[in-house]
Amino acid sequence: MVKLFIGNLPREATEQEIRSLFEQYGKVLECDIIKNYGFVHIEDKTAAEDAIRNLHHYKLHGVNINVEASKNKSKTSTKLHVGNISPTCTNKELRAKFEEYGPVIECDIVKDYAFVHMERAEDAVEAIRGLDNTEFQGKRMHVQLSTSRLRTAPGMGDQSGCYRCGKEGHWSKECPIDRSGRVADLTEQYNEQYGAVRTPYTMSYGDSLYYNNAYGALDAYYKRCRAARSYEAVAAAAASVYNYAEQTLSQLPQVQNTAMASHLTSTSLDPYDRHLLPTSGAAATAAAAAAAAAAVTAASTSYYGRDRSPLRRATAPVPTVGEGYGYGHESELSQASAAARNSLYDMARYEREQYADRARYSAF
């Protein structure tokens, strides 16, 4: 019986269709499809070779399928990692290169690196010696033993096989080889430099030997700062500020506080009325004198004090012709004449109804 691998299968392909396709060259014992690839078991080796020769790159539902003999990897094979491969290199060319040193069971290219499985370990060692750091298709490739394995748990590996060094008998997290590929030796150097290895965290923070000895001064400073920032200190500061405010308010004059309180509590005052605050002594006398002077100045102003509305203002009396005028009354006569002229002009100007002619002018 020969097992064949069928790759790049279309979604429309069925097991019955694949079986009937391979039965043209021999008896098919088994046919299995797994996603986009499958396996076919043919009884005769000659029939299997004919199927590979005729069905490889056969177009099925518009897709070229791949047919080749299935390669069972031997348990004793040696896996090599080949890095820095040319992007134009193919599996067949890389396989032929390594077959110069021994039989190759499997060859897989992944981007710019590949994995080559060789049947014998001595052939793999010879391939490393002969091909590592050599030119192949214009690029210098690197060949070394592969340390990658299938991990049973993330970051753990397996006791039966470490994925870092490939050896058995220890977990991957306990491997002496670190991630960079170097052997880590942290037993004696760590103990000599830092003393005893730290025990698990059984004590609370701050009580451990590793914090108090090294950071004693810092711990004392932290305690002082914490005491200064305590709740009692903040409360005392707030109380002192409150006492200072009360003492300052108590020093204000009692009379001023009483007058202000009466002014604020009075309900008969106009909210828009502006009054001067009560003062005492010379300040009150000066304020009264200033108010009286302002009143006299306003009364003596003829232009701004005069009401210019003809409706609210009374007409000034016009002197008669029979009245005589003596020396010293020219100023009074001139003032009366000016008042008469202004009043007559204003009356002639504002006597007519302002809104009577609105209808006549609204048409324009």
UniProtKB/Swiss-Prot annotation:
Changing residue 39 to A: Abrogates regulation of alternative splice site selection. It is found in: Nucleus; Nucleus, Nucleolus; Nucleus speckle; Cytoplasm. Pfam families: RRM_1, zf-CCHC. Phosphorylation on Ser-309 is induced upon cell muscle differentiation. Phosphorylated. Phosphorylated in vitro on Ser-309 by SRPK1. Phosphorylation on Ser-309 is induced upon cell stress signaling, which alters its subcellular localization and may modulate its activity on IRES-mediated mRNA translation. Signal peptide: none annotated. The modification Phosphoserine is found at residues 86, 309. The keyword Zinc-finger applies. The keyword Protein transport does not apply. It comes from the Eukaryota. Residues 2-72, 78-148 form the RRM domain. Keywords: Activator, Cytoplasm, Differentiation, Isopeptide bond, Metal-binding, mRNA processing, mRNA splicing, Nucleus, Phosphoprotein, Repeat, RNA-binding, RNA-mediated gene silencing, Ubl conjugation, Zinc, Zinc-finger. GO terms for molecular function: cyclin binding; miRNA binding; mRNA 3'-UTR binding; mRNA binding; pre-mRNA intronic binding; pre-mRNA intronic pyrimidine-rich binding; RNA binding; zinc ion binding. A zinc finger (CCHC-type) spans 160-177. One of its GO terms (biological process) is mRNA processing. Residues 196-364 are annotated as: Interaction with TNPO3. PROSITE patterns: RRM, ZF_CCHC. Changing residue 37 to A: Abrogates regulation of alternative splice site selection. PANTHER family: HETEROGENEOUS NUCLEAR RIBONUCLEOPROTEIN M-RELATED, OS02G0815200 PROTEIN. RNA-binding factor involved in multiple aspects of cellular processes like alternative splicing of pre-mRNA and translation regulation. Modulates alternative 5'-splice site and exon selection. Acts as a muscle cell differentiation-promoting factor. Activates exon skipping of the PTB pre-mRNA during muscle cell differentiation. Antagonizes the activity of the splicing factor PTBP1 to modulate muscle cell-specific exon selection of alpha tropomyosin. Binds to intronic pyrimidine-rich sequence of the TPM1 and MAPT pre-mRNAs. This is RNA-binding protein 4. The lineage of its organism: Eukaryota, Metazoa, Chordata, Craniata, Vertebrata.
